[in-house]
Regions:
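Short functional linear segments
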Residues: 1-46, 53-66, 71, 110-114
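Short active-site-proximal "capping" loops at secondary-structure junctions
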Residues: 48-50, 75-76
Length: 148
């Protein structure tokens, strides 16, 4: 798939999935090799201001010369905005290579009779994979799946 086809695929996900359990998300990450393991994760929850708090945390960590992955939503212009490494959205090339890895894991899940990941789960897995591949020290997340 090329970049445009990958975006189209992701945008179609809500049409054929239902909300999955936290165990499903954990299983999905296991198939990907648990890319989140060994990272320091800052998980921000609350009613208002999550995006601002996450952006502030990212700035603080970058000021301290730490490497930071930041997964946020929604995007304004481009889906890449949701996945940032050291303050920059990932490139189209990195988006596509990460998509390919996650898409392959989805095919394995489907072959094993497991349900397709949701839109959120798919992008979350892409973010964790991109962060692992980039070797970030810290991951900043806005709450998803009810804070779990």
């Amino acid at each position: 798939m090329d970049y445009r086809e990958a975006i189209a695929y992701i945008l179609e996900i809500p049409k054929f999935t239902k909300k999955n359990s936290l165990e499903h998300t954990k299983d999905f990450l296991r198939i990907l090799g648990n890319p989140e393991k060994g990272k320091k994760i800052i998980h921000v929850a609350g009613t208002n201001g999550k995006g601002s708090v996450c952006a502030y945390m990212q700035s603080l960590l970058l000021t301290e010369k730490k490497t930071v992955g930041f997964f946020t939503s929604p995007h304004l212009v481009k889906m890449n905005e949701r996945i940032r490494i050291d303050g920059e959205e990932i490139s189209d090339e990195m988006f596509l290579s990460t998509f390919d890895i996650v898409f392959a894991a989805v095919q394995k899940m489907k072959a094993d009779g497991k349900p397709h990941p949701t839109f959120f789960e798919f992008l979350f897995a892409m973010a964790m994979t991109a962060f692992a591949d980039s070797g970030v020290e810290y991951i900043i997340l806005e709450t998803g799946l009810g804070g779990r």
